[in-house]
Amino acid sequence: XIIGAPCRRCYHSDGKGGCVRDWSCGQQ
């Protein structure tokens, strides 16, 4: 789940209160 506010599309929580880009996003 997601804990707290979700990150932008294509990003996910880095577990330290920030967001990091989702490496798998848009890779088709």
Curated annotation (Swiss-Prot):
GO cellular component, one term: extracellular region
PTM annotation, UniProt: Occurs in 2 forms which differ in the post-translational modification of Pro-6. In form SHTX-1 (Shd1a) Pro-6 is a hydroxyproline while in form SHTX-2 (Shd1b) Pro-6 is unmodified.
GO molecular function term, any single one: potassium channel regulator activity
Keywords from the named record: Disulfide bond, Hydroxylation, Ion channel impairing toxin, Nematocyst, Potassium channel impairing toxin, Secreted, Toxin, Voltage-gated potassium channel impairing toxin
Subcellular location: Secreted; Nematocyst
Transmembrane segments: none
Superkingdom of origin organism: Eukaryota
Cystine pairings recorded for this chain: C7-C19, C10-C25
4-hydroxyproline found at: P6
Keyword Isomerase assigned: no
Family stated for the protein in its record: Belongs to the sea anemone BBH family.
Function: Kappa-stichotoxin-Shd1a: inhibits voltage-gated potassium channels (Kv).
Name of the protein: Kappa-stichotoxin-Shd1a/kappa-stichotoxin-Shd1b
Organism, as annotated: Stichodactyla haddoni (Saddle carpet anemone)
